[in-house]
C-alpha cells in the first residue's frame, strides 16, 4: 500500500474510532520494532491499532501476519514503558475497504 493510500485508510479508521466513542491518543508511533498506526482510548482501555486497507476484507486480513502482530505487540510494550503506563490495553486491527470498515478487537497470535 502506498503511503498516500495508507494515510487515507488511517484517516478513515481514526474517524471511525472517534464516531464510536474512542479518543485518539497518538498516531504513527515508531519504535525500533515497528509502528503503531493508531493509539486510542475508550472506557479505561488503551487500544493499539493496526490499520489494513485493501479492495476486499480477505485481502486485508491476510496482511495481518504473525510477524506484523509481533512487531505491534513489541512496539506497544515500548509505548507503555516510555510513557510509564500501567493500564488495561489490547491490540486491534481495523480493516478498511472502499465500502466498509471492520474493527477487530483484541487480536492475538
UniProtKB/Swiss-Prot annotation:
Domain of life: Bacteria
MF annotations from Gene Ontology: nucleic acid binding
UniProt cross-references to InterPro entries, sorted A to Z: Restrct_endonuc-II-like, tRNA_endonuc-like_dom_sf, UPF0102_YraN-like
Alphabetized HAMAP family for the sequence: UPF0102
Family: Belongs to the UPF0102 family.
NCBIfam families linked to this entry: PRK12497.2-4
Name listed for the protein in its UniProt record: UPF0102 protein Suden_1901
Amino acid at each position: 500500500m502506498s503511503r498516500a493510500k495508507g494515510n487515507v485508510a488511517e484517516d478513515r479508521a481514526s474517524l471511525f474510532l472517534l464516531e464510536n466513542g474512542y479518543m485518539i491518543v497518538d498516531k504513527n508511533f515508531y519504535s525500533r520494532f515497528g509502528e503503531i498506526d493508531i493509539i486510542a482510548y475508550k472506557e479505561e482501555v488503551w487500544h493499539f491499532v493496526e490499520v489494513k486497507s485493501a479492495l476486499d476484507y480477505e485481502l486485508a486480513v491476510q496482511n495481518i501476519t504473525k510477524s506484523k502482530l509481533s512487531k505491534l505487540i513489541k512496539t506497544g510494550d515500548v509505548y507503555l514503558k516510555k510513557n510509564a503506563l500501567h493500564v488495561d490495553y489490547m491490540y486491534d486491527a481495523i480493516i478498511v475497504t472502499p465500502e466498509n470498515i471492520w474493527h477487530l478487537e483484541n487480536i492475538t497470535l
